[in-house]
């Protein structure tokens, strides 16, 4: 089972800030995290059960590092619908 260390960050972009007004938050995690494990982590560490979770797997880009090809890390993004009255402000900032 995944734990809190698999959550990398909460994303703060222009798009995610617009989603936060509607009660959504976007969380970047390691690729091995699943919806059920994220739900368990949010319940255990933050004390709430999300209403809905959508996931998106993103492959790392191929980039050049000092003339050689390298690959950035793969990760998952989760779009989490928060219950009324719950916010994750100042977490991961």
Curated annotation (Swiss-Prot):
Part of the 50S ribosomal subunit. Contacts protein L29, and trigger factor when it is bound to the ribosome. The keyword Ribosomal protein applies. It holds the Pfam family Ribosomal_L23. GO terms for biological process: translation. Keywords: Ribonucleoprotein, Ribosomal protein, RNA-binding, rRNA-binding. One of its GO terms (cellular component) is ribosome. GO terms for molecular function: rRNA binding; structural constituent of ribosome. It comes from the Bacteria. This is Large ribosomal subunit protein uL23. One of the early assembly proteins it binds 23S rRNA. One of the proteins that surrounds the polypeptide exit tunnel on the outside of the ribosome. Forms the main docking site for trigger factor binding to the ribosome. InterPro entries: Nucleotide-bd_a/b_plait_sf, Ribosomal_uL23-like, Ribosomal_uL23/eL15/eS24_sf. It comes from Campylobacter hominis (strain ATCC BAA-381 / DSM 21671 / CCUG 45161 / LMG 19568 / NCTC 13146 / CH001A). The keyword rRNA-binding applies. Belongs to the universal ribosomal protein uL23 family. HAMAP family: Ribosomal_uL23_B.
């Amino acid at each position: 089972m995944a734990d809190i260390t698999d959550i990398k960050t909460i994303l703060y972009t222009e798009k995610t800030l617009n989603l936060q007004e509607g009660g959504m938050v976007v969380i970047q995690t390691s690729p091995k995290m699943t919806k059920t494990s994220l739900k368990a982590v949010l319940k255990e560490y933050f004390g709430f059960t999300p209403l809905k979770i959508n996931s998106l797997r993103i492959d790392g880009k191929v980039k050049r590092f000092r003339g050689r090809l390298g690959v950035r890390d793969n990760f998952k993004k989760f779009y989490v619908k928060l219950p009324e009255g719950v916010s994750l402000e100042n977490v991961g900032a």
